[in-house]
Regions:
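The feature captures the beta-strand-to-loop junction immediately N-terminal to the Walker
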Residues: 35-37
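Conserved small/polar residues in nucleotide/adenosyl-binding loops
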Residues: 40, 298-304
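Helix-to-loop junction immediately C-terminal to a conserved catalytic motif
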Residues: 50
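Conserved ABC transporter NBD signature motif
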Residues: 58-69
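ABC ATPase NBD coupling module
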Residues: 67-83, 221
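ABC ATPase nucleotide-binding domains
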Residues: 80-82, 95-229
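Glycine/charge-rich catalytic "coupling/switch" loops of P-loop NTPases
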Residues: 252-295
């Protein structure tokens, strides 16, 4: 069974095209990311899935049941979804414990309040109000509240964007653990490619035209990007243009092997930083000589491997 199926979805706001023929599927109990730059229509797509906006063209199915089309709109409260907004939307007049209990009062939940309190990791803050919590603590409470009613589908809109780097990594780890433990189908909107690769089983990359340009597992998109847009979404690359002769192209960093189908054509080659190896030894046959002009430390773009 598919948790979500989006078919030919298009949407306009004030006659401006926001979504353009969007199609994708989410398998049951899996995690998908909608990845794209600001203004690509990610949040609009999430609102349409949630039923917060009406569909103009196309179809949305949840658990194989149509919930939205141009002629049908199932109210949000009947879709069995959880929604975590960017600003968390906690009830300011309720304590942490009361916020967590609120969904249970209206739905039959497989969770009990004590089950979810362990996940929140705030045993000393249950009687505090949201304004007394840090941003990370509020995020934990909001996430737990969205899951406690055991929705069929969980929608997270940029859940980590307001957190500082160190706290973001900690909360992201906790979130992934909770999502895997709860087995809830989840769609996460983000503009951070590394975040998407870490937390999801499937990534759907959107462009500024409101279209999904490529979908697939993180490794597939990283290793086999469909075009330059997808390639550069996962980090900066060294770009070289040239003509293919004898199944190779000559670049400033050496000869690059190219598929024979590009013979005698002008092509663009993208090389990630980790694809270039430096050595003080004599230049190999396919290499080239150069001089290191500067070295700077920014951030890690290579996988971190823990050896035990």
């Amino acid at each position: 069974m598919l948790a979500v199926s989006i078919k030919n979805l298009s949407h306009k706001i004030n006659n401006k095209s926001i979504l353009n023929n969007v199609n994708f599927e989410l398998k049951k109990d899996s995690i998908a990311c909608i990845l794209g730059p600001s203004g690509s229509g990610k949040t609009t797509l999430l609102k349409l899935i949630a039923g917060l906006d009406n569909v103009q063209n196309g179809h949305i199915l949840i658990n194989d049941q149509e919930v939205s089309s141009a002629n049908k709109h199932l109210p949000t409260e009947k879709r069995r979804i959880g929604f975590l907004f960017q600003d968390y939307a906690l009830f300011p007049h309720l304590t942490v414990k009361e916020n967590l209990k609120y969904p249970i009062n209206f739905k039959n939940s497989i969770y009990k309040i004590d089950d979810i309190i362990d996940v929140v990791k705030l045993p000393d803050s249950l009687d505090k109000y949201p304004h007394e919590l840090s941003g990370g603590e509020q995020q934990r409470v909001a996430l737990a509240r969205s899951i406690i009613s055991h929705p069929d589908l969980l929608l997270l809109d940029e859940p980590f964007s307001s957190l500082d780097l160190n706290l973001r990594e900690e909360i992201r780890d906790d979130t992934l653990h909770l999502l895997q433990k709860s087995n809830v189908s989840t769609i996460i909107v983000t503009h951070d490619p590394f975040e998407a690769m870490f937390i999801s089983n499937q990534i759907n990359i959107m462009d500024n035209n409101g279209s999904i340009v490529q979908s697939g597992p993180p490794a597939e998109l990283y290793n086999n990007p469909k075009n330059q847009y997808v390639t550069r979404f996962f980090g900066e690359t060294n770009v070289f243009n040239g003509d293919v002769h004898n199944s190779s192209i000559k670049t400033p960093v050496g000869q690059i092997k190219v598929d024979q189908k590009y013979e005698n054509k002008n092509v663009t080659v993208h090389i990630r930083p980790q694809g270039i190896k430096l050595s003080e030894q004599p230049t190999p046959v396919n290499g080239t000589k150069g001089t290191v002009m500067a070295v700077s430390y920014t951030h890690l773009t290579l996988p971190t491997i823990l050896l035990v």
